[in-house]
C-alpha cells in the first residue's frame, strides 16, 4: 500500500513539529510504502500549494498548507488525513479539513469551545466530527530520563517559581509582576541545556501563555498550549497555571497534572485589578501549595504517567496512528 506525505519543511524555525513529521514518516513505513514530498525547494518557502489526487474546494487539486501542517494521502483512493500544529485553523488547515477527501484532522491546538466557530466560519459545521484533539510537544526532544534522574538526585531545590522565555514586557506582563514581587526566579535567556538544568533545580513552575486581554474571540490568539507545559510535564515538575480550555486527546487535568487556578477567578481578578490581580492569584496559589509535599508528589506522579503514555517510548506515534484511523488503510 502506497501513501504520500505532503509538507513544507521549515528547518530554520527549529521547532518540534518538523522532527515529529519526519519521525512519523519512519513510523508509517512499518505499515506502508511512504513517499515524502517537501515543497520547500529553495529552503525559504514555508507555505503554498501542494498537489493532491482529489479536489479541495475552489483550490482544485492544489490546496495551500503552511509549514506546521502535514497531509497524509492514500495514493490509491486520494483519501487524506491532516496533522496540524497551527494556532490559526482558519488560515490554511480548514481547507483540507473540510474537504470530502479528508476523513480525519488532528489539531495540537484544540479547543472544544472554539472549534465550532472555526468550522462555522468556513461553513463546514457538518465536518466537526472529523476534527479531533491530538498531542502537544516540547520545544525539541531531549533525554528525558537522564534529566529525571538528575532531578531525583538534587537535595535542595529553588523554592521560587521558575519561568524562562520572552514577552514579559509586552504580551506576558503578568509574569513580570510576579518576578518583581520576588516569587519568581530571575528571567533570563539560556541555552536549551541550561534551561533544562534550571527546570530540574526548581521545585515548582509557572505556566502562562498570554495576558488575558488577548483572548477576545475564538479567532484571536486561540492556542494556549506552550512548550513549557509539556517540558514541565515530561520532567515531573508541578506548575501553576490558569485552567486550560485547550485540550489534548488525553487531557491534562486541573489539580491532577498541574496546579490549577480556576479560569473564572482569573477573569474576575483581571477585570478588577488587571495583571496585578492575576499575579496575586498565582502568588496566593503558590503560597498554598509550596510546602504541600504530598500534593506536589501527586502532581509529579500523574505528570510522568501522562508523559510516558502520550509522548515517550514511541507512544506519540502510536497514538497519532490510532487517532488517524490509519489501520483501515492496511491491506
Question: Which role fits each region the language model picked out?
Answer:
Residues 1-2, 328-331:
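Short, Lys/Arg-enriched, disordered terminal segments
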Residues 2-49, 53-257:
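Nucleotide-sugar donor-binding catalytic core of glycosyltransferases
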Residues 200-327:
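Catalytic binding pocket for nucleotide-activated donors in carbohydrate/polymer assembly enzymes
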Amino acid at each position: 500500500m502506497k501513501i504520500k506525505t505532503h509538507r513544507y519543511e521549515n528547518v530554520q524555525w527549529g521547532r518540534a513539529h518538523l522532527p515529529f513529521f519526519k519521525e512519523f514518516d519512519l513510523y508509517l513505513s512499518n505499515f506502508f510504502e511512504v513517499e515524502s514530498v517537501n515543497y520547500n525547494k529553495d529552503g525559504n518557502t514555508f507555505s503554498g500549494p501542494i498537489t493532491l489526487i482529489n479536489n479541495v474546494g475552489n483550490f482544485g487539486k492544489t490546496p495551500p498548507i503552511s509549514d506546521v501542517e502535514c497531509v497524509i494521502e492514500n495514493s490509491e483512493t486520494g483519501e487524506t488525513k491532516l496533522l496540524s500544529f497551527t494556532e490559526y485553523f482558519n488560515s490554511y488547515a480548514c481547507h483540507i479539513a473540510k474537504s470530502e477527501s479528508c476523513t480525519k484532522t488532528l489539531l495540537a491546538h484544540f479547543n472544544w469551545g472554539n472549534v465550532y466557530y472555526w468550522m462555522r466560519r468556513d461553513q463546514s459545521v457538518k465536518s466537526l466530527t472529523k476534527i479531533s484533539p491530538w498531542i502537544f510537544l516540547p520545544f525539541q526532544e531531549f533525554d528525558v530520563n537522564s534529566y529525571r534522574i538528575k532531578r531525583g538526585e538534587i537535595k535542595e531545590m529553588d523554592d521560587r517559581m521558575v519561568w524562562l522565555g520572552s514577552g514579559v514586557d509586552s504580551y506576558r506582563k503578568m509574569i513580570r509582576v510576579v518576578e518583581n514581587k520576588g516569587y519568581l526566579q530571575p528571567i533570563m535567556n539560556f541555552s536549551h541545556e541550561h534551561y533544562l538544568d534550571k527546570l530540574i533545580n526548581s521545585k515548582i513552575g509557572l505556566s502562562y501563555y498570554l495576558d488575558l486581554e488577548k483572548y477576545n474571540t475564538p479567532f484571536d490568539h486561540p492556542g494556549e498550549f506552550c512548550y513549557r507545559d509539556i517540558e514541565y510535564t515530561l520532567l515531573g515538575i508541578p506548575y501553576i497555571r490558569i485552567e486550560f480550555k485547550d485540550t489534548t486527546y488525553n487531557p491534562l487535568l486541573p489539580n491532577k497534572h498541574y496546579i490549577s487556578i480556576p479560569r473564572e477567578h482569573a477573569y474576575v481578578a483581571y477585570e478588577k485589578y488587571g495583571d496585578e490581580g492575576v499575579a496575586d492569584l498565582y502568588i496566593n496559589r503558590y503560597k498554598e501549595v509550596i510546602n504541600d509535599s504530598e500534593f506536589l508528589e501527586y502532581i509529579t506522579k500523574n505528570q510522568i504517567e501522562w508523559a510516558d503514555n502520550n509522548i515517550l517510548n514511541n507512544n506519540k506515534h502510536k497514538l497519532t496512528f490510532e487517532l488517524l484511523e490509519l489501520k483501515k488503510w492496511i491491506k
